[in-house]
């Protein structure tokens, strides 16, 4: 029997399946809950049937700091790389959440900012969330994608009503991060832009 091996730059040729923490925990998610959920996926046999992804949703985000001004986790996710390494060690993959907006749905820091160094904080945003629900003039997709790759993440949920320019920036940032990371668009990617979503993401949610 002839075996044909094809090599290309396309990932996620079949729909990824797994677990996302938002419906269960919303903003109460933390490192211990993620690890417990990963363990449960293995213990219940789901991993052996193709369930591969353990995805952290909104509320992991802390502040931007360090030489790359990349977004860092808050106190709920100490040693985030160690957590990802553990998820990988039990045969699963790890996913993370972000948004092109200054602030996420839950009021945490996004991938853009109104200040050059991305100085917004959760406490500041929470006072008037509606003031931060826009795409800021300063963009940090490259910084954040590089950091996600260094932590070892395999999947990114990119949230809120998508526009092509923001999607293009994150798509290319992930492709140039040095790691294969699936880009999932959520939520309400306008259907009339479907050709762009096909070109610039691995999966998308229309509305």
Q: What do the PLM-derived regions correspond to, one by one?
A:
Residues 5-31:
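An acidic-aromatic substrate-binding cleft motif
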Residues 9-14, 46-49, 87-89, 149-150, ...:
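Extracellular/periplasmic catalytic domains that process cell-envelope and extracellular macromolecules
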Residues 24, 61, 101, 189-190:
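Short, solvent-exposed loop/turn segments at secondary-structure junctions
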Residues 37, 41-166:
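Aromatic-lined carbohydrate-binding/catalytic grooves of carbohydrate-active enzymes
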Residues 70-72, 111-113, 170-173, 197-204:
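Short secondary-structure boundary/capping segments
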Residues 130-132, 140, 182-207:
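Glycan-recognition surfaces
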Residues 152-156, 160-189:
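Extracytoplasmic, non-cytosolic globular domains
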